[in-house]
A protein has these predicted regions:
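Glycine/charged-rich beta-loop-alpha catalytic/anionic-binding loops adjacent to active sites
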Residues: 37-51, 136-140, 259, 291-295
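Phosphate/diphosphate-binding glycine-rich loops and adjacent basic-rich segments that engage nucleotide
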Residues: 112-145, 149-154
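Short, hydrophobic beta-strand segments
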Residues: 133-135, 191-199, 231-238
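Acidic-enriched catalytic cores of C-N bond-cleaving enzymes acting on peptides and small amides
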Residues: 123, 145-184, 203-228
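Acidic/histidine-rich catalytic neighborhood of metal-dependent amide-processing enzymes
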Residues: 37-126, 168-172, 176-178, 182, ...
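Zn-dependent metallopeptidase/amidohydrolase metal-coordination segment
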Residues: 187-189, 262-320, 329
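Acidic/His- and Gly-rich active-site-bordering loop/insert found
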Residues: 1-45
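Active-site-adjacent substrate-binding region
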Residues: 154-171, 178-180, 226-227, 236-285
Length: 337
């Protein structure tokens, strides 16, 4: 949970185990989380092991504010207009729901600061849909059920067994998509299934949606119109809005290199607020916030990584002004997957 968070500061981290709570034997161990070994000598921040830390996205907020503070304290640094927005509901998929581009006049593009190590950069995310399926059974006394009862649980099991068993999260990686059954409950009278589909590729994503529609049609033909389905598209891959605007990507990568970072361009197996902001006319790829082990008791971040984020943001602002004057880096994007 996020109540009573008690941050712990570990200066000059030595790469060894960190006992978050000795009594409850809660330990942050680099043998379990080897990325910690890359943080030796840095100032590590953790929780006390009983809550999450909230790095996602307190680290991003801190980096953005540090950039604003730096620019404010150094008026000699030339830059254009800079807008910063904080969306409190990103983790429940509503962070960009009430984002109004009219509040950000003349903004050409933006960046989210959502997870990732320094150097990570993402402009390719999932397409996403959530699906609900309702199945209607017929209840009859079991002793008189022959030829009459239709058990919704049996129908549900038949539907689930027809889903692709090799296209699930635990068997997917890189640019693979998947089907995921989140919840299924049933009795004889009715059954309900909640699931999601994810895919980077638009055509594969469309095929997954159509597969569900066809499977429902098949089940209805087999059992007599007892299945209803509702498919709600949640968000679209931001690549669709960025692929023809290479400057947005190149500017960030130029700023990374200027900050001494080696860019690590990758696909993001999820979504960000950029998935909701990009369709509103402001293409928004994702940078990083520097944390690790998000959403759990073993979350961490370092002061140095947040500082690096602030440096990158400052360099994006100043580099944008420079390239606007001297010529933009419009090098075409290359597929990296």
């Amino acid at each position: 949970n996020a109540v009573n968070i008690k941050p712990q500061i570990h200066e000059n981290y030595d790469g060894q185990k960190i006992i978050l709570d000795e009594k409850d034997n809660i330990v942050l161990d680099p043998t379990e989380f080897p990325d910690l070994l890359n943080l030796k000598g840095q100032t590590l921040i953790t929780s006390d092991g009983h809550t999450l830390l909230g790095v996602d996205d307190k680290a991003g907020i801190t980096g953005a504010l540090a950039m604003l503070k730096y620019l404010t304290e150094h008026p000699e640094i030339e830059h254009g207009d800079v807008f910063v927005a904080f969306g409190p509901d990103e983790e429940i998929g509503c962070g960009g729901q009430y984002f109004d581009p009219a509040d950000f006049p003349n903004v050409e593009f933006a960046y989210t600061l959502d997870n990732g190590r320094p150097g990570d950069f993402e402009y390719d995310t999932f397409n996403a849909s959530e699906i609900t399926i309702h199945i209607k059974g017929t209840v009859v006394h079991p002793g008189e059920a022959y030829g009459l009862m239709v058990n919704a649980t049996t129908l549900m099991n038949d539907f689930l067994s027809n889903l692709p068993q090799d296209q699930v999260p635990e068997k997917s990686r890189n640019h693979d998509g998947y089907f995921l059954v989140l919840h299924a409950q049933s009795n004889v009278d009715h059954a309900d299934i909640s699931m999601i589909i994810r895919d980077f590729d638009q055509s594969e994503y469309n095929r997954k949606e159509q597969f569900i529609r066809d499977l429902v049609k098949k089940m209805n033909k087999k059992y007599g119109n007892r299945f209803t389905v509702n498919i709600r598209e949640q968000y679209e891959n931001i690549y669709n809005y960025i692929k023809d605007k290479p400057y947005i990507v190149n500017l960030a990568l130029d700023a990374y290199r200027k900050s001494g970072l080696k860019p690590n361009v990758q696909s993001f197996r999820g979504g960000t607020d950029g998935n909701f902001i990009s369709p509103k006319g402001i293409p928004t790829p994702n940078l990083f916030n520097g944390g690790g082990n998000y959403h759990g008791r073993y979350e961490y971040v370092t002061v140095e990584q947040i500082d690096k984020l602030a440096e990158v943001l400052t360099n994006i602002v100043t580099e944008h002004l420079r390239q606007t004057r001297t010529g933009r880096n419009e090098k075409p994007l290359e597929k990296y997957w």
